[in-house]
Structure formats: C-alpha cells, structure tokens
UniProtKB/Swiss-Prot annotation:
The lineage of its organism: Bacteria, Bacillati, Bacillota, Bacilli, Lactobacillales. Belongs to the TRAFAC class TrmE-Era-EngA-EngB-Septin-like GTPase superfamily. EngB GTPase family. Keywords: Cell cycle, Cell division, GTP-binding, Magnesium, Metal-binding, Nucleotide-binding, Septation. This is Probable GTP-binding protein EngB. Transmembrane segments: none annotated. SUPFAM superfamilies: P-loop containing nucleoside triphosphate hydrolases (SSF52540). GO terms for cellular component: cytosol.
Length: 199
C-alpha cells in the first residue's frame, strides 16, 4: 500500500486527551480531525485504518468520547477524535461545552490539515451532519466525507444512497467522498490516499 511507504500506519498509539488548547500537543505535526454523530463509527474507523482492534475504544453507548483524543501515527501524523455530536442523553450544558471545545480546536489549531466528516451511508444526512459540513465549508477547512456502515446497504443501492447523502449535504463535488465499511474493510486505502494528500 502506498501509505505504508510514507508512514507505518500500524505504529500508532493514543497520545493524550485534551479539554482545551492548553492541553494540545506543542509541536508542528500535521493533524487530521475526525468528526461525526455519536455512534456513526468514528472509533471503528480509527481502529480499521490503523489495523488495530481496540486502540480507539468502541462503545454501544453513544457519547462516550468527551475530550479531544490525539492519536500518534508513526510520529508523522496525528488523528484527532472529537466528541460525537447529536447525542440526546447529554445535558444542554454539556453539549454546549463540547461544541465550544470542538469549535475552538477546528478554528484555531494551526496543525489541522483537514477534517474527516463521518456520515451514516444508510440514511440522509442529519441536521447535525449538515451543520458540521456547512461549518467546515464556511471556515474553509478541507473536508473529506466518509460514509460509514456501507456493509448495511446492498451494493446495488450504493449509487442511490451516495446521491441521497450528497444531496442532503448539498455536497461540494470538489470534496472527497469515500464509501467505507469497517466490517468489510472497504475504503481503507482510499481513506489513506486522500488523507495523505493533505500532509
């Protein structure tokens, strides 16, 4: 795989968790952030592209990621898992705190190169997904759309679902759109090829 010539994707570890910028790593390593609704499969995405079973903790209970989690990949790149949005069982105050933390990171972090915005391939994008996409476009932050859980959609319906998701997002055709499945290991190489374009 081309990405392995550039970085050893299996040489990865969780570096730290941060609540605000005073806790961020203090160097110039490039970062790719991962954003998406609770339970869209962010942890599974991280584990799958890094070839690890449980580096990022997966949970059947949405809303488990409450801090910015920084993952070091081969000392050349960091993946940053931000708290999942759209989880109803969190208090308004807690949701507001998460929102502020995410916004501060996305709008002020010099290391940030692009955001992988994960959406559920089975459904139209939620209002939260649309707001996140519009936010990233407004701030001119490069965005990669990764449509997860593709194994739950029959292949004969993929074109229809891709069109549905893109239409609901008002998708910019210049952005990358990757169909992904952790279960069937679909979209791993394409995800890395796209991420590496931003380093």
């Amino acid at each position: 795989m081309s990405e392995e010539q550039i970085l050893n994707t299996h040489n990865a570890s969780i570096l730290l968790s941060a609540a605000n910028k005073s806790h961020y790593p203090q160097d110039d390593l490039p970062e790719i952030a991962l954003a998406g609704r609770s339970n869209v499969g962010k942890s599974s995405f991280i584990n799958t592209i890094l070839g690890r079973k449980s580096l990022a903790r997966t949970s059947s209970k949405p809303g488990k990621t409450q801090l910015l989690n920084f993952f070091n990949v081969d000392d050349k790149l960091r993946l940053v898992d931000v708290p999942g949005y759209g989880y109803a069982k969190v208090s308004k105050a807690e949701r507001a705190r998460w929102g502020k933390m995410i916004e501060e990171y996305l709008t002020t972090r010099q290391n940030l190169r692009a955001v992988v915005s994960l959406v559920d391939f089975r459904h139209e994008s939620s209002q939260d997904d649309i707001q996140m996409y519009e936010f990233l476009k407004y701030y001119e932050i490069p965005v990669i759309i990764v449509a997860t859980k593709a194994d739950k959609v029959p292949r004969g319906r993929w074109n229809k679902h891709e069109s549905m998701v893109k239409k609901s997002l008002n998708f910019d055709q210049t952005d990358a759109f990757i169909i992904f499945s952790s279960v069937e290991r679909i979209g791993i190489d394409e995800s890395w090829d796209t991420i590496l374009e931003y380093l």
